[in-house]
Every structure is written in structure tokens, then in C-alpha cells.
Regions:
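Charged, solvent-exposed interaction patches on well-folded alpha/beta domains
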Residues: 1-208
Length: 208
């Protein structure tokens, strides 16, 4: 069976020794082929005139986590294996970020990611929120959006519920959130708002 992530790309190199002969490049995308950046990369690599150009082009791709490249001796064949970075959220519709907070350009080709918006200085707070909220077994709390504002602080939105953490993320708030989620699991009732900003407890709103 043909690997759907394996691309065979016939290239024409313009060096004098290979003029008029096809140069075959096989690229295996370990993480799949789903980004516009990958398509642009394929178009660009067709224009490469040497092995150095190929390697420089790969090194310039911020979405590539790691790669290996092998040239077949005495033949016009190159084998490239590429592992993509795996984004988990998009910041202000400008950049992808993976779990290690590596940044790479957002190309609007992948939509099923957490959209994060706001003037955020410490992106570790975003990872902390994702880990806390999605640690629950309730599928209703799969995050769609995380918003930060100077007025409201951190708001996390799932399909049906808004979770409000306020301006400062504390261990007490996270503990209150976990205790509340455990309670909601027991009663099988999901509120429209979970507000953990209060010192004395958690406010639940079941309104539409």
C-alpha cells in the first residue's frame, strides 16, 4: 500500500552534469500532510539546484521539528524524512505554538486548534490552563478559545461552558476548578458558566 504521506517529486536540476535529467526526491512527512506551508515547501524544493539548496530550504522551515536526508550514490535520488512540529494553539491568528512553546507561522490551513487571543506576555500560563482544564474526563470541557483581557483576566471557552479564572492563576483556583468538575460529573449537569474568581468558592450559572 502506498504511504499517503510519501511524496515522489521529479525535479530538474540545472547543474551542467544533470541538465535535462530528472532528479527524483522522495519526501516522507511523518506527521501527515495538512499544512499550506508544506505545499509551499514542495513548490520551492522543485526549484533547488543543489543539495546545499535543499538543505538550506529545509533548515528555513520553522514548522519542521527534525529531519533526515539521504542521497543515493551515483543516482539522481534523494530521500527526505520530515517530522512536523505539532501545534496545539494559535496566538492572535498569527502564530502556531506547540507544547514546548516553539513558534511558527500560522497559515490558516488548520482550524481545529485552540484559538488564544489577548495581550499575553507569559505563554506558559496558556499551557498551564490547557493542562488544567483538559485534565478532566468531561468531553464538554474541550477548549475552543482562551481569551485574556486586562478587565476580565483569563476566560476559557468550550462548546457549552465559559470558565472564568480571573487575572491571576493560582493553585487554589485550580483546586476549586477540579473539585467543581468532580461534583458536576457526579450530578451529570453542566453549567453555562463556571466562575472560580471568588475567594470563598465557585459560582455556577446554568442560564443560556
Amino acid at each position: 500500500m502506498l504511504n499517503k504521506n510519501l511524496l515522489l517529486i521529479p525535479l530538474i536540476f540545472f547543474a551542467s552534469l544533470s541538465l535535462g535529467k530528472n532528479y527524483e526526491i522522495s519526501i516522507n512527512f511523518e506527521s501527515g500532510f495538512e499544512y499550506q506551508s508544506q505545499k509551499q515547501f514542495i513548490e520551492s524544493i522543485k526549484l533547488s539546484k543543489s543539495s546545499k539548496e535543499i538543505e538550506h530550504l529545509i533548515d528555513d522551515q520553522d514548522w519542521i521539528k527534525n529531519y533526515s536526508i539521504r542521497y543515493k550514490p551515483f543516482k539522481k535520488e534523494v530521500f527526505i524524512n520530515i517530522k512536523n512540529r505539532e501545534p496545539i494553539f494559535v496566538l492572535n491568528e498569527m502564530y502556531f505554538y506547540d507544547r514546548d512553546l516553539n513558534k511558527f507561522n500560522f497559515d490558516h490551513s488548520k482550524k481545529d486548534l485552540i484559538m488564544v487571543e489577548g495581550p499575553i506576555d507569559d505563554l506558559r500560563q496558556v499551557i498551564k490552563l490547557i493542562n488544567v482544564v483538559e485534565s478532566t474526563t468531561l468531553s464538554q470541557f474541550k477548549i475552543n478559545n482562551i481569551n485574556y483581557s486586562y478587565v476580565n483576566g483569563w476566560d476559557v471557552k468550550s462548546n457549552n461552558t465559559l470558565i472564568r479564572f480571573g487575572k491571576k492563576l493560582t493553585k487554589k483556583k485550580f483546586n476549586n476548578y477540579h473539585e467543581t468538575v468532580n461534583y458536576l460529573f457526579e450530578i451529570s449537569k453542566i453549567p453555562s458558566i463556571i466562575d472560580v474568581r471568588y475567594k470563598d468558592g465557585v459560582a455556577l450559572n446554568y442560564g443560556k
